[in-house]
């Protein structure tokens, strides 16, 4: 007996882990793609943990060689492009490595995964879900590289959906709001490291407002009521829907963020973030 399979990237923790568990509990066979195999799903029969480095095309190809060998029993019907990393930094202090890593993981690698997956999903007339964030609606100071990646992923989703309109494959985007996941654990430490490795004159400009932003972000994410399970339920709903919608939000904050991007003028959005940015006197320190 065959069983529909779904590939979930970024499955080792956080939102991806929750989605894998939810899908498996509801009868799907799940390929859980992780950077390092740790046997976290070894006791669950319908989850297969597979190694995947999104910055390495050979790693992506090897994953799909394995998936291709399973198609008789577990035809690939779904893809959840969930993997993502976020390195906070003022754009002036942003390291090239951090920018490239975020683009490789959040955009380029996921496009490559989609390219490899499409022949299988087109055959099964399946579904693709791209996970972005509220930062795909409004670009946020000190999360510039991540915002760039999320805007790119929104465009990637729109183009893919339009190109596949008559293929039988559906494409949806999910924008979660603030949800605590391990991605936040290194937020303040990473930000401080970037400041410590910056030239003194540049650090003086951004240090106060950047540290305040990092601390406020951690406090904010620890106070939200939206959970990983809420996210996982949305993913399951998309795969169970007769006809999935093109756009989903997880959490009121995500929907509100998107609405503000449509209602507020650019000037109003700039003013909204004004208190988060360096002051005129801080720029005069150099």
From Swiss-Prot:
The active site is at 146 (proton acceptor). It catalyses: 3-amino-5,6,7,7a-tetrahydro-1H-pyrrolizin-1-one + AH2 = 3-amino-tetrahydro-1H-pyrrolizin-1-ol + A. Keywords: Oxidoreductase. It is an enzyme of class 1 (oxidoreductase). One of its GO terms (molecular function) is oxidoreductase activity. Involved in the biosynthetic pathway of pyrrolizwilline, a pyrrolizidine alkaloid. Catalyzes the reduction of 3-amino-tetrahydro-pyrrolizinone to 3-amino-tetrahydro-pyrrolizinol. This is 3-amino-tetrahydro-pyrrolizinone reductase.
């Amino acid at each position: 007996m065959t069983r529909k399979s779904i590939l979930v990237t970024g499955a080792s923790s956080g939102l991806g882990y929750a989605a894998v568990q939810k899908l498996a509990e509801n009868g799907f066979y799940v390929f859980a793609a992780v950077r390092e195999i740790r046997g976290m799903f070894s006791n669950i029969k319908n989850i297969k943990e597979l190694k995947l480095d999104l910055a390495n095309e050979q790693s992506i190809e090897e994953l799909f060689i394995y998936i291709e060998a399973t198609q008789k029993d577990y035809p690939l019907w779904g893809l959840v492009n969930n993997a993502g990393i976020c390195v906070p930094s003022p754009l002036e202090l942003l390291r090239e490595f951090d920018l490239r890593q975020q683009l490789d993981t959040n955009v380029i690698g996921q496009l490559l995964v989609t390219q490899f997956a499409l022949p299988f999903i087109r055959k099964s007339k399946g579904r693709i879900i791209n996970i972005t964030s509220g930062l795909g609606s409004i670009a946020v100071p000190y999360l510039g590289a991540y915002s760039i990646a999320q805007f790119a992923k929104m465009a990637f989703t729109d183009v893919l959906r339009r190109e596949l309109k008559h293929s039988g494959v559906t494409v949806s985007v999910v924008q979660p709001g603030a949800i605590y996941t391990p991605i936040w654990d290194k937020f303040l430490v990473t930000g401080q490291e970037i400041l410590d490795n910056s030239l003194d004159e540049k650090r003086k400009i951004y240090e106060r407002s950047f540290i305040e932003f990092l601390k406020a972000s951690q406090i904010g994410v620890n106070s939200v009521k939206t959970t990983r399970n809420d996210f996982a339920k949305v993913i399951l709903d998309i795969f169970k829907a007769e006809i999935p919608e093109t756009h989903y939000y997880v959490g009121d904050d995500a929907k509100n963020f998107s609405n503000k991007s449509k209602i507020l003028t650019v000037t109003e959005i700039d003013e909204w973030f004004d208190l988060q940015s360096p002051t005129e006197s801080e720029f005069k320190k150099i």
